[in-house]
C-alpha cells in the first residue's frame, strides 16, 4: 500500500492546533479546513489531466484541467468537515456519503447511511475522514466502494494510528493513504494516542443520539 505522510511546516502547524486541547470548536474547524486543503492538494498530485488552448488577454497558452475529477466521499460525521476544503480545491468533484458511528462499548463501526453512485468503475475516489484509528470504519467504507467497482481509492486522514494503517495495508483493498501524521498507538477506548480527541465532537459538539 502506498502511504504518503505530508511533511510540511504549515501542515504540522495546523495539526498542532487540532491536537491542542485548548482549541475550541471554531479554532479546530479552521485548522481542519486549512489542513484538509493541503492534504487534498497532495492527494490530487497524480490525477490525470488533459490540455487545451486557453486564450489569455495577450495570446494563447496551454491550459490544464482534470481529465475526470474524483468523487469525494466523506465518512459522516467528522468527514463532513473535509467537504468544503476538498471542493475548494476540486470544485467540479461529485460528492457521495457514508454514515458511520462508533459503538462506544465494542468500538465497532455502526453504518447508518450510504449514498453512492452504483458504478464507480474507472473513477478516482477520495475518502475523507479526519482520523484513522482501528481502521474499522474506513475498511467498511472501502468495501462498499470496491463492491461498486472502485479500483482507485485514496484515503485522506489528518491523523492515522499505526494499528489502523496496518489493518489497511493487510486488507488487500485498492487504497493508498495520504495523512499528516502516523501516531504509534490506541488506548483502551480505541482513541489514537496522542491523537486529537474525538474529531466529530471537536467539530460539532458531543453526539447526542444513542446507537
UniProtKB/Swiss-Prot annotation:
5-phospho-alpha-D-ribose 1-diphosphate binds at residues 77, 102, 129-137, 198. SUPFAM superfamilies: PRTase-like. Uracil binds at residues 192, 197-199. Coiled coil: none annotated. Its cofactor is Mg(2+). It holds the Pfam family UPRTase. It catalyses: UMP + diphosphate = 5-phospho-alpha-D-ribose 1-diphosphate + uracil. Allosterically activated by GTP. Pathway: Pyrimidine metabolism; UMP biosynthesis via salvage pathway; UMP from uracil: step 1/1. One of its GO terms (molecular function) is GTP binding. Binds 1 Mg(2+) ion per subunit. The magnesium is bound as Mg-PRPP. Its EC number is 2.4.2.9. Keywords: Allosteric enzyme, Glycosyltransferase, GTP-binding, Magnesium, Nucleotide-binding, Transferase. The keyword Glycoprotein does not apply. One of its GO terms (biological process) is UMP salvage. Catalyzes the conversion of uracil and 5-phospho-alpha-D-ribose 1-diphosphate (PRPP) to UMP and diphosphate. Belongs to the UPRTase family. PANTHER family: ADENINE PHOSPHORIBOSYLTRANSFERASE, URACIL PHOSPHORIBOSYLTRANSFERASE, CHLOROPLASTIC. This is Uracil phosphoribosyltransferase. It comes from Corynebacterium aurimucosum (strain ATCC 700975 / DSM 44827 / CIP 107346 / CN-1) (Corynebacterium nigricans).
Amino acid at each position: 500500500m502506498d502511504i504518503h505522510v505530508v511533511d510540511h511546516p504549515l501542515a504540522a502547524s495546523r495539526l498542532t492546533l487540532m491536537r491542542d486541547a485548548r482549541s475550541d470548536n471554531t479554532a479546530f474547524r479552521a485548522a481542519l479546513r486549512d489542513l484538509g486543503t493541503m492534504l487534498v492538494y497532495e492527494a490530487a498530485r497524480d490525477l490525470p489531466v488533459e490540455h487545451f488552448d486557453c486564450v489569455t488577454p495577450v495570446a494563447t497558452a496551454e491550459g490544464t484541467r482534470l481529465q475526470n475529477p474524483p468523487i469525494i466521499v466523506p465518512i459522516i460525521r467528522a468527514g463532513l468537515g473535509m467537504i468544503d476544503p476538498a471542493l475548494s480545491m476540486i470544485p467540479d468533484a461529485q460528492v457521495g456519503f457514508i454514515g458511520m458511528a462508533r459503538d462506544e462499548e465494542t468500538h465497532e463501526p455502526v453504518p447508518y447511511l450510504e449514498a453512492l453512485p452504483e458504478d464507480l468503475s474507472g473513477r478516482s475516489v477520495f475518502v475523507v475522514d479526519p482520523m484513522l484509528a482501528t481502521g474499522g470504519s474506513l475498511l467498511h467504507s472501502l468495501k462498499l466502494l470496491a463492491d461498486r467497482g472502485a479500483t482507485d481509492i485514496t484515503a485522506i486522514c489528518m491523523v492515522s494510528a499505526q494499528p489502523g494503517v496496518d489493518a489497511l495495508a493487510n486488507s488487500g483493498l485498492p487504497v493508498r493513504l495520504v495523512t499528516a501524521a502516523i501516531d504509534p498507538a490506541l488506548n483502551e477506548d480505541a482513541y489514537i494516542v496522542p491523537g486529537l480527541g474525538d474529531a466529530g465532537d471537536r467539530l460539532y459538539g458531543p453526539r447526542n443520539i444513542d446507537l
